[in-house]
Amino acid sequence: MAECDDRPNLVERAVMKLGEPKNQARLLQVAWRISLLMMVIGFIIIIKTISPNFM
């Protein structure tokens, strides 16, 4: 059987690292930029669908 040690495994360390406020702020910034980019792409698709000669 495998030994039980008190060291956190890779997943637990990654979750603890993401829980730090500095990393949460960076993650929020990246998520906000991705959502903004998706919104802009969606508007471009809508405009191109409504008016094919635009752009």
From Swiss-Prot:
UniProt-listed GO biological process terms: proton transmembrane transport
One cellular component term from this protein's GO annotations in UniProt: plasma membrane
Subcellular location: Cell membrane
Variation of activity with pH: Optimum pH is 5.2 for ATP hydrolysis.
Subunit relationships: Has multiple subunits, A(3), B(3), C, D, E, F, G, I and K(x); there may be a few other subunits as well.
Other notes: This organism has both a Na(+)-translocating F1F0 ATP synthase and this H(+)-translocating A1A0 ATP synthase.
Job of this protein: Component of the A-type ATP synthase that produces ATP from ADP in the presence of a proton gradient across the membrane.
Designated name of the protein: A-type ATP synthase subunit G
Organism lineage: Archaea, Methanobacteriati, Methanobacteriota, Stenosarchaea group, Methanomicrobia
